[in-house]
UniProtKB/Swiss-Prot annotation:
Gene expressing this chain: CYP1
A GO BP annotation: protein folding
InterPro entries listed in its UniProt record: Cyclophilin-like_dom_sf, Cyclophilin-type_PPIase, Cyclophilin-type_PPIase_CS, Cyclophilin-type_PPIase_dom, Cyclophilin_A-like
UniProt cross-references to Gene3D superfamilies, sorted A to Z: Cyclophilin-like
Protein name: Peptidyl-prolyl cis-trans isomerase-like 1
Keyword annotations of the record: Isomerase, Rotamase
EC numbers on record: 5.2.1.8
GO cellular component terms attached to this protein's record: catalytic step 2 spliceosome
Record domain PPIase cyclophilin-type: where: 1-155
Organism field: Gibberella zeae (strain ATCC MYA-4620 / CBS 123657 / FGSC 9075 / NRRL 31084 / PH-1)
Length: 162
């Protein structure tokens, strides 16, 4: 069974396909946080052109967020999964085994992240939205000048057509 997540953002919708076989604990964390409304009305606090779009911090600072397992949990690195191009969904971290709630989507190949960040999905639909996000004007700490927000995140139920 494939798990899909819809992120309704201020710039358009994204459908994320989660890699539940490769990163079950990470996908469980993300899906549970989505169901709890954890990501609703949070911002993408860091956007770097030709690199990535990062969100998932309820404080909006890039220093907050926690997992359903407590503050942090361990990496689930699958050597078969690589940051090969735009649209890879991966966990943001502050070093090994420091996953919480923050995530990023790549805007280009980022091979230097391989083996350091848990890849747990991909953008299934909405690459145009992600690419537009990557072009927004940013200020200090790569923070968008105008907020880019997740208005609502939801799990697509099995019977639902997407």
């Amino acid at each position: 069974m494939t798990t899909n997540i819809v992120l309704e953002t201020t710039m358009g919708s994204l459908i994320l396909e989660l890699y539940t076989t490769h990163a079950p604990k990470t996908c469980n964390n993300f899906t549970t946080l989505v169901r709890r409304g954890y990501y609703d009305n949070t911002i993408f606090h860091r956007i770097i052109p030709n690199f990535m779009v990062q969100g998932g911090d309820p404080t909006g600072t890039g220093r907050g967020g926690s997992s359903i397992f407590g503050e942090k949990f361990e990496d689930e690195i699958d050597p078969g999964l690589k940051h090969t191009g735009a649209g890879i969904l991966s966990m943001a971290n502050a070093g090994p085994n420091t996953n919480g709630s923050q995530f990023f989507v790549t805007l280009a190949p980022t091979p230097w992240l391989d083996g350091k960040h848990t890849i747990f999905g991909r953008v299934k639909s909405g690459m145009g939205t992600i690419k537009r996000m990557g072009l927004v004007k940013t200020g200090s700490e790569d923070r968008p000048v105008e907020e880019v927000k997740i208005v609502k995140a939801r799990v697509v139920e099995e019977e639902e057509q997407i």
